[in-house]
A protein has these predicted regions:
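Acceptor/aglycone-binding surface of glycosyltransferases and processive sugar-polymer synthases
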Residues: 62-81, 86, 98-181, 208-225
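Hydrophobic helical membrane-anchoring modules
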Residues: 1-4, 150-151, 174-241
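A conserved acidic beta->alpha catalytic loop
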Residues: 36-45, 94
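Acidic helix N-cap motif at the loop->helix transition within catalytic regions
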Residues: 16-20, 41-50
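Short loop->beta transition adjacent to catalytic acidic/histidine clusters or analogous donor-positioning motifs
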Residues: 3-5, 26-34, 42, 56-57
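Conserved sequence signature across two-component system core domains
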Residues: 11, 35-37, 62
């Protein structure tokens, strides 16, 4: 079963965390694609070394920082071209638990869904070691996106996901322009637009122990701008005679 899955892990300066995560994934006999944005700390080299030992890790090293959305689109293309049935998104920083991944995979196998989202904000979901301000920001962002875009997904910004490739290929990835965490919102929206079956599964999100968060004002602004634009565009379309 695990040969049907590809884990896509974008990285930028995650040399400590990635050295913990990858061995855990290898214990599950999973294939892994690391998309590194030119990390100066040697993340790509560390991943390549693990790949030589296991034969299960491929590293795509890009020359500069191109963003989360671009990294995942590159990973999707790689997985689609090689016939993987399911494509997993997972953070490199250890915030997504491998124990939860097993639950997501099992649910994908049994539910017939097209997108499984590891959700912090449904019953049973949780976050650990977050400041109240950050939790408020994440919850508010998801409420805002849901109000403007519709749908029932509670955690549209979640980055712990499994896509069914047969459905994912129906999305024109070249037209997906979001770069930061807004990419997750846009992909949720696109999956809904093609009538994809989306299911949220509760997870526990644990704040990183090592490295620095990639969240920035630019990423937050992109999400506000794009979600507002999508929401207003949909509203005006509905009002047309």
């Amino acid at each position: 079963m695990n040969r049907d899955y590809l884990v896509i892990v974008p990285t930028y300066n995650e040399i400590t965390s990635i050295g913990i995560l990858l061995p855990q994934l290898l214990e599950l006999n999973l294939d892994i694609l690391v998309v590194d944005d030119g990390s100066p700390d040697g993340t790509a080299d560390a991943c390549r070394a693990l790949g030589l030992e296991s034969g299960r890790i491929v590293v795509v090293e890009r020359k500069k920082k191109l963003g989360l959305g671009s990294a995942y689109k590159a990973g999707f293309k790689y997985g689609e071209d090689r016939g993987y049935k399911f494509l997993i998104e997972m953070d490199a920083d250890g915030s997504h638990q491998v124990s939860d991944l097993l639950t997501l995979m099992s649910t994908m196998e049994t539910s017939g869904s097209d997108l499984i989202i590891g959700s912090r904000w449904i019953s049973g979901g949780a976050v650990q070691n977050w400041a109240r301000r950050r939790e408020w920001l994440s919850r508010s962002a998801n409420v805002y996106a849901r109000l403007l875009l519709g749908g029932k997904v509670k955690d549209m910004t979640a980055g712990f996901r499994i896509y069914r490739t047969a459905k994912l290929i129906q999305i024109d990835l070249a037209s997906v322009k979001s770069e930061g965490y807004c990419f997750q919102i846009e992909m949720t929206k696109r999956m809904s637009q093609i009538d994809g079956v989306i299911l949220e599964v509760p997870i526990t999100f644990v704040e990183r122990k090592y490295g620095v968060s990639k969240m920035s004002k630019k990423i937050v602004f992109e999400a506000i701008y794009r979600v507002t634009a999508w929401g207003l565009s949909a509203k005006f379309r509905r009002k047309r005679p």
